[in-house]
Amino acid sequence: MSLASGPGPGWLLFSFGMGLVSGSKCPNNCLCQAQEVICTGKQLTEYPLDIPLNTRRLFLNENRITSLPAMHLGLLSDLVYLDCQNNRIREVMDYTFIGVFKLIYLDLSSNNLTSISPFTFSVLSNLVQLNIANNPHLLSLHKFTFANTTSLRYLDLRNTGLQTLDSAALYHLTTLETLFLSGNPWKCNCSFLDFAIFLIVFHMDPSDDLNATCVEPTELTGWPITRVGNPLRYMCITHLDHKDYIFLLLIGFCIFAAGTVAAWLTGVCAVLYQNTRHKSSEEDEDEAGTRVEVSRRIFQTQTSSVQEFPQLI
């Protein structure tokens, strides 16, 4: 699924125009050298302005930044390396990285991310390494979040709040070599089955295999998520527990009761129908007998009249 095809000419024209204004200054308290800007540990609360437009490597780690403005970040069209580790970023908006389509390395670990939309990384087709570990409030990922990051080789999802993951989320990552999934509260219930089977079928073995374990259900607590495929298949597809047997028993009883009632109603209807037909036949016979008797009396009356007529003459 292609969510975006890169920045259009309008964005590039806008970036060029802004570049004429911005110049090539260096942010206060930051170090700028050879297309590299280092603002590590400067207690910044906002994204720094005056970053040279030819910057290729930008270090914003160990600060207090809460957001990444797409308008300013998008001016760095040559940026290939962005480190935002250990800040206070809560969310990255749709198309936050629309102007940095050359980005190869992105570190958003140890922040306060709560959600990532399917469009956040939509233009980062060149991205090779992505780290979003240590975001404990990140509870879910959309199945198309990584749809366009087809060059990704390294993905770190450790220590987030992820409880399950749609198998489609990793389906497009055919070049992925390193995957970290440990430290997450994986709920290995029936909704987790598709992802567990996906890990087996596509040989998607996390680099921290033995540490990426289930926290639920009790039967699978501590099991590596790469090894719960078969147990889950048994529990969710082929295995019947006592609730299933009770359900089947109730279904059988309902079918039996419904059949019995239906048979009884059929019998009652048949008896009523036969009684109705019998009464109708008796009435028809009585009516026929009455007609015969009337006809006989009329015939006798006419015969008597014919016999008496000559005597009167």
Swiss-Prot record:
Residues of this chain annotated as glycosylated in UniProt: 112, 148, 189, 211
Ranges for the LRR repeats: 54-75, 78-99, 102-123, 126-148, 151-172
Residues in compartment: Cytoplasmic: 266-313
Highest taxon of source: Eukaryota
One GO location term (cellular component): plasma membrane
Disulphides: 26-32, 30-39, 188-214, 190-236
Sequence intervals crossing the membrane: 245-265
Post-translational modification (record): N-glycosylated.
Expression sites by tissue: Mainly expressed in testis and skeletal muscle.
Repeat as UniProt keyword: yes
Membrane topology of the entry: Single-pass membrane protein
Keyword Cytoplasm appears in the UniProt entry: no
Entry domain remark: The transmembrane domain is necessary for interaction with KCNMA1.
PANTHER family hit by this protein: GH08155P, LEUCINE-RICH REPEAT-CONTAINING PROTEIN 52
Protein name (database record): Leucine-rich repeat-containing protein 52
Gene giving rise to this polypeptide: LRRC52
